[in-house]
Amino acid sequence: MVNLLIETHNLSKTETLTIHTASFMKTITHLLALLAAAVCLSFAAETWACTSAVISGKVTPDGRPLLWNIRDTDFRLNHMAYVKGQRYDFVANVNSANFPALKEAWMGSNSAGFALMNTQSYNLVEVKPGEERGEANGRIIYRALELCATVQEFCHFLDTLQKPSYIEANFGVIDAQGGAAMFEVDYYGYTMYDANNPKDAPYGYIARTNFSFAGKVNQGSGYVRYMEADGTLMQASAMSQITPLWMVNRLSRSFCNRLLQVDLRDGCHNQPEASGWFVDQDFIPRNSTSCSIIVQGVKPGENPALTTLWTLLGYPPTGLLVPLWVSDNMPPMVAYDARFKAAPLSHQSISMADRQVFAYHQGMGTGKYLHWEALWNRQGNGLMQQLQPLEAELYRQSEATLTRWRQSGKPDQKEMKQLYEAIEAKIQESLLRW
C-alpha cells in the first residue's frame, strides 16, 4: 500500500499539468459546442447527462455486484479499448475522436476486477471563468484503472492527488472483494457512500445522475432521471430482479418520465391515438447517449478475470448488448474501425438513431423530437422490438459460456474468441435483413 501511495502522489503532480495542456483545445471545442447548443435549442438542454448506479451483491440474484452507467456526451462515437496499464491492464470506453491522444477513459474494468465509472456532477464546485467543469474526470478514470485494485485503494488514490484536482463527479466503483461504493468528488475532497452499508444504501444500491447529495440543494441536473432510476431499482432490489439484461431493458431503455407520469410504452402516444412523436426530455436514454455499460463483478474468491463488461455502444434503443472481458482478444465489433472512425456497433446504432429516431431536422432545435413510433409500436415491428429478441438470444448464449467458465475457475481464451465470432456473425446476419 505504501508503494501505491507514493507512486500515485508523484504521478499526480505531472498529471495535473498534462490535463491542463492536453485539455486546452478540448476546452475550446467544448465551449463552442455549448454555445452552439444554447443558440440552437429553445429550451434547456443538459450536457453529459449521465445516469448510473452501483448495486451491492446483497440484492442481485447471483450475489455479484453490478456497476451500471448510461453515458451522454458530445462525443457520441465511441469504442472499447484494451490498455496495457502501468500496474493493471484494462478495457474501457473511450472517445473515438481523441483516443489515445488523450489518455481518458469513461468507464471500464481492469485485470484485478476493479471497475470504475463516472457521471458529471453540477452542484459540487463553483467553476471559475476559464475552467472546464470536471476537466480531470476522464484522466482520473484512466489512471485509477491502471493503478487500483480495490475500493480502498481508490480512496488512497483520491487522497494523494494534488489539489485542486479539477474533478467534479460521482464515481461508481466495484471490486473483486465484493466492494461497491459511490464517491462524490470535488476539487479538494470526497464523500463516500458504501452500497454494502444499510446506513448509506438501505435498499442495497446507490443511484446518481448529475447532482451530488453532498452538493448544493436543488442545483445540478438530472433530478427527473434520478426519480426514474431510483424508483425502478427500489422495487427490483426487493425482488432480486437486478441483472445486466434487466438493467439495460428497464433502465437504459426506459421511456418513463415520473414528473409527467408518462410511460411511452403504454401505447397512448402511438398511432392512431397520437402522432407517434414525443419530445426527448428527461428520459434516461437521450439523443446525446453514446453507450451503456454494466460491469458484472465477481464473488469474493472468484477469479477477477471473470468480471464481465456487458457493453452496449451507441443509443441503447437501437444498440445491442454484448459481453467483454479484460483481454487483448478484443472483438472487431467494439474496437476502433477506421472506416467508421468508431466501433462498428457504435456507428451502426448512432446512424440508425439519427436516420429513424431523431429524424426530424427542419430548423433549429428540432433534434429533441423523438420518433417513438419508429422505436416501439402496436404492430411490434419497431426498432427496439426487433432488436431485443436477438439480444436476448446473444445474452443466453453468453451466460451459458460464462457459467462454464465460473465452474472451471477461469475464462477459456479459445472459447472467448469463438463466442465473439458467433455473436458478430449473428449480428451481421440480422442487420443485413433490415
Positions of predicted regions on the chain:
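Sec/Tat signal peptide C-region and signal peptidase I cleavage site
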Residues: 43-49
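Bacterial N-terminal signal peptides
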Residues: 33-43
